[in-house]
Amino acid sequence: FESVTAVDSINLTIQSGTYCCLLGPSGCGKSTTLRLIAGHETPTSGDILISNKNVTVRPPAKRGTAMMFQNYALFPHLNCLENVAFSLKMAGHKKAERNERAMAMLSLVEMQDLKNRLPSQLSGGQQQRVALARALVGNPDVLLLDEPLSALDPFLRKQMRAELKQLQ
């Protein structure tokens, strides 16, 4: 096998309230970089700073980040509303509050009418919108999106770009 270097060296400063897109060919380390920032991978050297705070050893839930994975990572046994509200439940929010916040995010991505459906009952684009709502519900400092528009049709892709810009 060839020697594989997963993200050799990177220094990246992103101003608050701005977009940053990582572009490159498949296998160049874009997803790995996002997973490192989110805390789902551990760097072998260097530090990860968010808002000038070293978060390198913090678990994902303590970093102020949310990641929407390329494969969506929705819980198959939970409906849309429960998927979006899950992190709020784990954080100890009361059911009424978490359902209200989850519904607001489902409305934002135009999935409120499908709140009771399981992921297996949704199209790829619908699953992607639920995953985005789940990433947004905790109001993260840093939102990490891995291929956020890939499963959307051209109309929804344009609409989602506008919604992401509005969230900025």
Model-identified regions with their sequence ranges:
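Short coil-to-helix segment of the ABC ATPase nucleotide-binding domain corresponding to the Q-loop/switch region
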Residues: 78-86
